[in-house]
Amino acid sequence: MGSVRKASAWLGLVDDNDDERYYDDDYAEGQESGEAWVTDPRVKVASETAEEKGRRIGTVTPDSFRDARGIGELFRDGVPVIINLTAMEPTDAKRVVDFAAGLTFGLRGTIERVATRVFLLTPANTEIVSGEAAGRPTDGFFNQS
């Protein structure tokens, strides 16, 4: 097929029957062996592995210091916890933050302020991916200032 014909076929001006030469409708069907793929029982599908680990994040909005126990139990089980202290009195909120700081220190986790009076507690070996532009170049196409 010449280049003009290819261009015309690409634009849809002529029919492209070039592919029909290569297809054979009369192909021989082979005997199916009946063997199926056998997977190793130790191999697991990625979605099954994620469900087994129980990836979840706990959110707690405590009313008083008595709710600190629930925060501690979630964090002790390896669940990252978001604590929203906006509904608490400032003195009780300070006590909860002190408790959370001790909890994260004792279990080798981290505590991070996400917003005003909102904190994120992450257990050890948990990675936090930030959406900030720290790693992006400051100049380039997207810098239109």
Swiss-Prot record:
Gene source species: Streptomyces avermitilis (strain ATCC 31267 / DSM 46492 / JCM 5070 / NBRC 14893 / NCIMB 12804 / NRRL 8165 / MA-4680)
Cited InterPro entries: Cell_div_SepF, Cell_div_SepF/SepF-rel, SepF-like_sf
Biological process (GO), any one: FtsZ-dependent cytokinesis
Name of the protein this chain belongs to: Cell division protein SepF 3
Cell compartments where the protein resides: Cytoplasm
Keywords: Cell cycle, Cell division, Cytoplasm, Septation
Stated family: Belongs to the SepF family.
Complex formation: Homodimer. Interacts with FtsZ.
Pfam families xref list: SepF
Predominant location category: cytoplasm
Organism domain of life: Bacteria
